[in-house]
C-alpha cells in the first residue's frame, strides 16, 4: 500500500568517527537544521555531532561488552511513498520519537526530500539520560507491525505499517 510509513532500523555506529560521518550525512542538505530531542530544538550539525559523540562515549562506558563491535547508537529512516507533506511527516516523526525516547535518550532527526519519497533520518543515542547507566536496547525479536503514528493519523489520515520497527526497552 502506498499510504504507509516504513520505519527501518538501518544500523548504528561502532566508532566516534562513524557517528560524525552519519550526522554529517543526515544534515547534508541543511547543516544548520538538525532537530534535537522532544522540543525539536534546531541545532547545527557541529553541535549535534558533539552531543552524539559524547553520548557514544558514555554508552560505551556502560556497555556490557568492552568490544569495538557493539553499536552505541541506532540509526533509523522513516519513509513514505511519494512526496508526503514535509511538515506532517516531520510532525509524525517528532511525536513518535517523543513518545518513545523523551527524557530517556537523546535523538536527532533530519528531513531529506531529494528522492521520490520524502524521508527522515534519525539517530538515537543508546546512552541513558538518567543516572541508571542502562543503555537503550532495540529488541528486534518483538516487531511491532502496527504501531500508529498519531500525527499522521490525525493530519493526513495515513495508516502506519512497517516491517522493521522494534519494541524499545532498556537493557540491563
Question: Which stretches of residues belong to each language-model region?
Answer:
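N-terminal nicking endonuclease/strand-transfer module with a His-rich metal-binding environment
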Residues: 1-172
Amino acid at each position: 500500500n502506498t499510504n504507509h510509513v516504513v520505519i527501518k532500523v538501518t544500523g548504528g555506529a561502532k566508532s566516534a568517527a562513524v557517528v560524525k560521518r552519519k550526522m554529517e550525512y543526515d544534515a547534508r542538505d541543511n547543516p544548520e537544521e538538525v532537530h534535537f530531542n522532544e522540543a525539536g530544538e534546531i541545532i547545527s550539525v557541529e553541535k549535534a555531532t558533539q552531543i552524539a559523540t559524547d553520548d557514544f562515549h558514555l554508552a560505551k562506558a556502560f556497555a556490557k561488552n568492552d568490544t569495538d563491535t557493539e553499536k552505541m547508537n541506532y540509526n533509523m529512516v522513516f519513509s513514505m511513498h511519494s512526496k508526503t507533506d514535509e511538515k506532517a511527516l516531520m510532525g509524525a516523526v517528532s511525536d513518535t520519537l517523543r513518545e518513545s525516547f523523551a527524557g530517556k535518550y537523546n535523538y536527532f532527526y533530519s528531513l531529506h526530500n531529494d528522492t521520490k519519497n520524502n524521508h527522515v533520518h534519525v539517530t538515537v543515542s543508546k546512552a541513558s539520560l538518567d543516572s541508571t547507566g542502562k543503555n537503550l536496547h532495540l529488541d528486534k525479536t518483538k516487531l511491532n507491525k502496527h504501531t500508529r503514528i498519531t500525527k499522521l493519523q490525525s493530519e493526513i489520515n495515513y495508516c502506519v505499517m512497517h516491517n522493521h520497527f522494534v519494541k524499545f526497552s532498556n537493557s540491563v
